[in-house]
């Protein structure tokens, strides 16, 4: 997301996911499945807008983000007392997620890992130069769509645990830290994965004993990591 200059896409899809939650609550349906449906549709629309406004990509994110918030607010207002359920998705709670959601997270994590290992070179080309990827015979539009959809599904499944307000931070910061440490594309990926695991596990551990919100604790840990790496970055680059 960062290398493709689409960091705000995670924010956008998290807000759209909140709209999916509101739709589920309003219709009395499963919020998980409604969120996934809404996110997939949003991912398709986001790719269309990204291509339409190629030189102004922030326009597409602003349009969908505003729409997601507007739909979520209106439907939560119409849902009446059920709006309290929507509030829990704003900040999330790792202790309230269902076993079904945990299994879904493991499945999407496995899918992302397999896709990364199988298509790391095509993703490298797609990330840095779409024109070269197109000349190389890669299905650029399809790959971009799948990238958006997988990202959206991951965000939708993370929201019950991390909350829509902080899920984008949890997704972006490990990669941003990895970019400061890693020297190659692959090393950045592995550093981001390692930092993400350490930050998530330590955040859950600390939040349990300090009785603080897990998502906020994890976010602050990642920010602390980012600050430390930024301070010592000259030494890391020198090595």
Regions found by a protein language model. Give the residues of each.
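Structural signature of hydrophobic alpha-helical transmembrane segments
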Residues: 26-41, 106-110, 156-170, 216-217
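Transmembrane alpha-helical segments in multi-pass inner-membrane proteins
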Residues: 167-216
């Amino acid at each position: 997301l960062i290398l493709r200059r689409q960091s705000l896409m995670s924010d956008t899809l998290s807000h759209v996911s909140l709209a999916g939650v509101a739709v589920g609550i309003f219709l009395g349906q499963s919020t998980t499945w409604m969120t996934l449906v809404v996110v997939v549709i949003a991912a398709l629309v986001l790719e269309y807008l990204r291509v339409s406004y190629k030189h102004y990509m922030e326009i597409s994110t602003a349009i969908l983000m505003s729409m997601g918030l507007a739909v979520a607010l209106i439907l939560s207002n119409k849902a009446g007392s059920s709006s309290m359920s929507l509030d829990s998705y704003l900040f999330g709670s790792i202790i309230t997620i269902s076993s079904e959601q945990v299994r879904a997270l493991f499945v999407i994590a496995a899918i992302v890992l397999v896709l990364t290992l199988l298509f790391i070179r095509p993703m490298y080309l797609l990330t840095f130069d779409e024109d070269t990827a197109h000349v190389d015979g890669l299905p650029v539009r399809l790959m971009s769509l799948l990238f958006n959809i997988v990202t959206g599904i991951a965000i939708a499944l993370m929201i019950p645990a991390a909350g829509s307000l902080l899920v984008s931070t949890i997704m972006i910061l490990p990669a941003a830290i990895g970019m400061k440490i890693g020297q190659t594309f692959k090393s950045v990926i592995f550093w981001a994965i390692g930092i993400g695991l350490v930050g998530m596990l330590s955040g859950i551990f600390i939040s349990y004993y300090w009785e603080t919100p897990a998502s906020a604790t994890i976010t602050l840990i990642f920010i602390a990591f980012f600050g430390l790496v930024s301070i010592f970055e000259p030494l890391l680059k020198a090595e």
